[in-house]
């Protein structure tokens, strides 16, 4: 709990009483994809920050919790339609995975406990540096069929000096199975790990 002194100018309403209009947002929630987890339990997810739906500003968070989620349906994307993964967050006992400690432009970050890591489909992998990324074949790890699977993709363009670090390269789904299910990359797939030459990029 935090107290913060502020000055507000009330407005006299038609009933001649002074009133304040106050807008408070004390929580937010959403479904995203886990990108990486270190041996120490630090994780990164989502691939972009959580923004206020009304203002578009990056939300400042004091604390958060990470829970298991399930994808229950896919709205296929197409021309003029972004498509999305629909699912639910399981807040039941024992489904909490960890904490959310930072909300930044490139994603949300926090810690996952040792015991909770055992629930996740993990595999150890090297990190690819940006100078190692090249155009050509790659894979996207994502869950659209009830489990995490690798799907073929193509890195079509690289932007090494792009001002927005979220736009380091362009990727196109080439896997016929994934195209048949989602039509390409849809909302909810942000943060899906991209693998090239056996490394997480």
Please state what every model-predicted region is.
Residues 1-201:
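C-terminal recognition in membrane/secretory proteostasis and scaffolding
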């Amino acid at each position: 709990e935090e107290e913060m002194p502020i000055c507000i100018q009330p407005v006299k309403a038609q009933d001649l009483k002074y009133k304040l209009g106050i807008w408070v947002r004390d929580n937010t929630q959403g479904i995203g994809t886990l990108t990486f987890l270190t041996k120490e339990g630090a994780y990164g997810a989502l691939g972009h920050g959580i923004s206020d739906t009304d203002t578009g500003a990056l939300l400042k968070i004091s604390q958060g919790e990470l829970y298991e989620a399930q994808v229950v349906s896919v709205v296929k994307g197409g021309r003029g339609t972004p498509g999305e993964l629909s699912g639910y967050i399981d807040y039941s006992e024992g489904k909490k995975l960890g904490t959310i400690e930072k909300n930044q432009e490139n994603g949300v970050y926090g810690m996952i406990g040792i015991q909770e890591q055992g629930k996740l489909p993990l595999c150890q992998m090297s990190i690819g540096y940006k100078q190692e990324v090249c155009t050509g074949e790659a894979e996207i790890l994502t869950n659209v069929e009830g489990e995490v699977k690798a799907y073929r993709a193509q890195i079509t363009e690289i932007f090494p000096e792009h001002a927005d670090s979220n736009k380091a390269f362009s990727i196109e789904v080439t896997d016929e199975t994934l195209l048949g299910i989602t039509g390409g990359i849809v909302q909810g797939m942000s943060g899906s790990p991209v693998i090239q030459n056996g490394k997480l990029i």
